[in-house]
Amino acid sequence: QKSEKREKRRQNVKTDQGGKKVMGMKKKMLSATLCAVMVGSLAAPAFTVQAADDTLVYWSMWEATEPQGQVIQEAVDAYTEQTGVKVDLQFKGRTGNREALQPALDGGTQIDIFDEDIDRVNGMYGKYLLDLEDLAKDNDYEATANAGLMAACRDAGGGTLKTIPYQPNVFAFFYNKDLFEQAGITEEPKTWDEFKDVCQKLKDAGITPMTMDDAYATCVIGYHLARLVGEDKVKEIVTEGEWDDPAVLQMAQDIEELASNGYYSEMVGSNVWPAGQNTELALGTAAMYLNGSWLPNEVKEMAGPDFHWGCFAYPALTDGANGIETNNFGAQVFGINKDTKLAKEAFDLITFLTKGEYDQKLADETVGIPADTTNTEWPAMVECAKPVIEQSTNRFTWACGVESNVDMTPVIKENFIKLMAGSITADEFVSTMQDAAK
């Protein structure tokens, strides 16, 4: 009789893929029901109870040990406790995701939810994405979503919403407010002439105006060219070899002027990431650095708690194709597999992660930007980027299209670094690009 009781107890205990014991179906459904009654006191969105044997498979781009992974794990656990929907959360990391996701999707592996950056998901994995227009409408999702990011997702999806953004980011000039104050600078530059004035004031105060690392060199040339002629034309230049376009020489002359005036760090020609951001910007020897809004988090240990961050958009150029309303901004995004049998549950989990409590927690723990517009408290280190995000109505993709020709990217990077370092002239840069494109 005792052995029979033990056997019944054993059958009423199940073990999930993480090795943790969980309640049997009846107990779990009861617990989920109680949780659903209590959700009014929770900040995260509430959902109706689902069957306990529903299992979502979510491949994550994060590592389990990263702050993003830790918050996502906590949110998934809370979602499962609240709804009864089990989630097989697999942390793949960036390399694992990029190497394994495509063949897994091609092979029909059950993956209900996956994530990566907006362009990669909509581009590389686009044919596997579920149309989310109806789900978003039924859940009134966009009422508290960033309109610019949702528009970017639709644009990346060919006019249809196929992904949901989280962890927004923007690529702009980040700077040391204390150094600006020392140089008597009271306003952030909006035009190229104003930007050069800022550089000169910093130099006159004995401060290196800006630095750069090799990893982001293409972002500088991309931004400047795209300001002049727009991203589509930038792509045309690099893919069709149109390096004789007058905009290329204009860009090169603008950068040559910065270099000849001593506005770049003397280390810009030899900096290998993260040397510039860690040893020059973070330590206060250079004032500005063109980078993503993840930068303050990356250098916080070196910069310390007393570093006062500022941020402004890449300046507008005279007679340019666009201005400071157009920026390289984006996000990581969630996609749902078009073949999923749990579309509603998948969208509910994504909503749980991108609204309310866990969206705010993800921003706080990663020193990132909230996706939910009702989460108005941004981490102090990135609050400076809020005006740039809010003024952005048009979007550049990564490096503003200058990396569209993979065969040319290494040549562009190498010679643009030389241009910033002052070791080649604008004319030499143009001729080198023309020769390389032949």
Predicted ranges, named:
Residues 53-64, 85-90, 113, 162, ...:
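Short, well-ordered beta-strand elements
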Residues 77, 82, 86, 159, ...:
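Extracytoplasmic/periplasmic substrate-recognition and gating elements
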Residues 78-145, 181-190, 279-280, 285-288, ...:
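Extracytoplasmic "Venus flytrap"/periplasmic binding protein-like
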Residues 104, 112, 139-179, 208-209, ...:
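A structural signal for short loop-to-beta-strand junctions that line the ligand-binding cleft
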Residues 118-172, 196, 247, 310-312, ...:
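Hinge/lid segment of periplasmic solute-binding proteins
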Residues 129-134, 294-300, 317, 332-406:
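Mature extracytoplasmic/periplasmic domains
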Residues 156, 165, 328, 365-374, ...:
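C-terminal capping/gating helix-and-loop segments adjacent to ligand/active sites or protein-protein/ligand interfaces
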Residues 199-201, 239-269:
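Glycine-centered hinge/linker elements that transmit conformational signals in sensory
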